[in-house]
Amino acid sequence: MAEINERASTSSPPVPSTPAPVPHIRQLADNMTDKVGQFFQHQLEGSIEEYKLLETMNNTTAQRYVDMKVVAEKVAGKLDNLNQKYENLRPYLSQIDAMDESTRRLEEATAVLENYVTQLESKLTNIQQQSQ
């Protein structure tokens, strides 16, 4: 193994000369470089357009949320107004409920009295028929 290392270190291999590029190959390489450059340029332009679209969508969404916030604030204000009106009407609504309950009880009492009157009329009719 020492022999191999000695040979490798003592002699240097000849450096091959690089052949001059053939004009056709040079033209193909330049063409490829141009096409790759155009490809990357279009990729970058596409990415930039996508970012611009995302930015526009983001701004539109942000504006939509601002608009929705304004609408929600208006609805909340109107709801507060309606709640205040309801609170002002609550005593009257309680009176209406009380009158409704009284009316229901009067209707029940009327039904009982009508049954009683019907029974009395039937008894009176029976008594009159027996006396004849």
From Swiss-Prot:
It comes from the Eukaryota. GO terms for cellular component: BLOC complex; BLOC-1 complex; BORC complex; gamma-tubulin complex. Residues 1-24 are annotated as: Disordered. Signal peptide: none annotated. GO terms for biological process: endosomal transport; lysosome localization; positive regulation of gut granule assembly. One of its GO terms (molecular function) is gamma-tubulin binding. Residues 13-22 have a biased composition (Pro residues). Component of the biogenesis of lysosome-related organelles complex-1 (BLOC-1) involved in gut granule biogenesis. Belongs to the BLOC1S2 family. Component of the biogenesis of lysosome-related organelles complex-1 (BLOC-1) composed at least of blos-1, blos-2, blos-4, dsbn-1, glo-2, mutd-1 and snpn-1. This is Biogenesis of lysosome-related organelles complex 1 subunit 2. The lineage of its organism: Eukaryota, Metazoa, Ecdysozoa, Nematoda, Chromadorea. The gene is blos-2.
